[in-house]
Amino acid sequence: MNAWSLKVPGVIVNYIPASTKTYIGSPSICILPNGDYVASHDLFGPGSDEFTQGMTSVYKSSDRGKSWKKISEIHGQFWSNLFVHKNVLYIMGPSKHHGNLIIRRSTDNGIAWSEPSDSTSGLLREGEYHTAPMPMVIHNGRLWRAVENAKSFTTEWGKRYSAMVISAPLESDLLKAASWTTTNFLPCDTTYLDGKFRAWLEGNAVVTPDGKVIDFLRVATAEKGRDLAAIVDISDDGLTASFNPSEGFIDFVGGARKFSIRYDEKSKLYWTIANMITDGHSDMDAGAVRNKLVLKSSSDLKNWTLNKVLLYHPDVKKHGFQYVDWQFDGQDIIFLCRTAFDDRFGGADNYHNANYLTFHSIKNFRNTRIIGSFKNPSPPR
């Protein structure tokens, strides 16, 4: 045991020991109209049923995250995000690992959920889909979300994922498949980045400063220590996705791990919480370095400011702060983290296979001190 042992950061929402071979994934958090926080996570690993029927647990806090209570389990829900639309709670994602794309509604703030049995009750698209708890964006009278189509000529991770965006009119019934419009699918092209491109995934639907919807994606590359993101352009009607490989890749700290981007009207800035590679780990696969979590901001989506180091542990093998989902809450940001950390039984299985779900807040985030900046010569179009 050392000085870092057992000092689990944040408020523990759930804990599962590594011995179960079941790990905590896909944190999601949203704020209900009454001010309560609702959080969720799924389960993955050999001890779970992720490939046959995803399972998501839902929690509620009525004291601004100080304590949490489990309120429901959803069987047949995976890699999903919670969100509120017109004062009603929804959850959206695949039915299992690479399952159908579905959506559920709860009229009692997360205790009971609708069943997506057909195309009029939440079964949006049959097939194989991939995503994470990604943001919903309102723009031009529509609700937008990025996902990935996972049906391909191969089952290889990364190569099977095609970028796409799905959207629906704000006044439509979100449980009806017919309400949703999808773009074409843009498959992984391994010739990109001089043959070093491995995947794009976990895209964010984001509205650019000039009012265009883009899909801002995590990128996996064969180049050690390289953090990149990809910018896919989406047509105004939500039907066409297009990509220019000569301009569409940008250097983006944290781009090799999942991140979420949201726009704050008050500061007129885009914000994200992402992983940052620390000194001494630049020779590693960037996607495997998750021991440092930072807050960043940008006015243009290409040049980013480092505002605050949120979480850090010197070890990268069995410690990780990852897959953060977050929300603005007045002057603060609240966030939920998939945390691999010490426990009394030897700690997490590894940095990836998390044993904790933890809640955190960033007080007065708009006043966080600027630590550094990351300039990027390649603007998103």
What is the predicted role of each segment?
Residues 1-26, 30-78, 83-132, 137-198, ...:
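Beta-rich carbohydrate-recognition and catalytic domains
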